Amino acid sequence: LLTILLCSSLLCQAQKERIILGDEQTSEYFPILKGKRIAIFSNHTGMVGDKHLLDVLLENKFNVVAIFSPEHGFRGDADAGEHVSNSVDKKTGVPILSLYDGKDKKPSEASMRKFDILVIDIQDVGLRFYTYYITMCRLMDACAEYNRKVLLLDRPNPNGHYVDGPILDMKYKSGVGWLPIPIVHGMTLGELALMVNGERWLPASRVC
């Protein structure tokens, strides 16, 4: 089951709109997380104001049991393409689970059994060869397979609604191109996740 908290705008006193990110809407998603074993998919971009989402959840006594980190690692200090194995976040002590310890470049069943709900909070840039959306899709597939819920805290696409480039020919599907979308696709991760479900693009036509 996929739940998405979309971004919204707030008209401030200065008559300027400020984007309210999905992760700032704590009154909406804290009740969803209550009593759950939580895993997060995030990195150094997952900031709620001046604090990381992980710190916000732990400060509010939520049971965060695992972290899935994307390319470059949870703290953003790994090299491009570097394999990130199981480890522990030095700051919080929360285990970091490998995304690739199972078959088909997905988390293993043992990793998936550790949590009830996956929270996604990561900044994407709307490019087909950017790997974060590919990791999201693989996690959505694993969550669909093991009946785990997904909560996606959405963020704006910095390239707006700009769309450009050819759609990927799926015979060239790879680790830097996973969906039949343009090079610049013009969607947020939340919008893309909805499209993945709607078009049944996950393996075996699974729906998260």
Task: Identify the residue ranges that each predicted region occupies.
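Bacterial Sec-dependent N-terminal signal peptides
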Residues: 1-17
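N-terminal phosphate-binding or glycine-rich loops at protein starts, especially the Walker A/P-loop
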Residues: 18-62
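A short helix->loop->beta-strand "cap" motif at the edges of active sites that frequently abuts
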Residues: 62, 145-149
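Short internal beta-strands
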Residues: 63-73
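Glycine-rich, charge-decorated loop segments at or immediately adjacent to ligand/cofactor-binding or catalytic sites
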Residues: 76-81, 151-173
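Glycine-rich oxoanion-binding loops at beta->alpha junctions
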Residues: 85-115, 127
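Glycine/threonine-rich flexible loop motifs
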Residues: 124-136
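Conserved anion/nucleotide-ligand pocket segment
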Residues: 173-208
